[in-house]
Amino acid sequence: MSEYLLATHGLTKQFGHHKAVDHVDLHVKKGSIYGFIGRNGAGKTTFLKMISGLSQPTSGEIEMLGYKNAQLKNVRSRISCLIESPGLYGNMSAYDNLAVKCRLFGINDKRYIENILKTVGLSN
């Protein structure tokens, strides 16, 4: 297993002719904390979406916890990223917002969602 928690090699995301992320190589050692700072449109959110499995790269490789590219679904439940916009739907309850996010990761267990809400004091 690699000494790195996360490694990207030539990671690229292209929308039409625009490269939002262009051949990024990154190696994050276990126990490290990183932040991404840059102007609007620099590709920060696009990069985070790719490494968290919410978007597929146009090219390049992602390795996390020993899993690569298509195998990353095996670690999705163990990773998270905090993006400055909250990504919540104002017209939905806390339960419904959480259920939407859980479905993105293949989690459809009502008890799981209820336990999370109870943990943070939002049950009922």
Label each region the model flagged:
Residues H18-K19, K73:
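Short coil-to-beta microelement around the adenine-binding A-loop and adjacent beta1/P-loop entry
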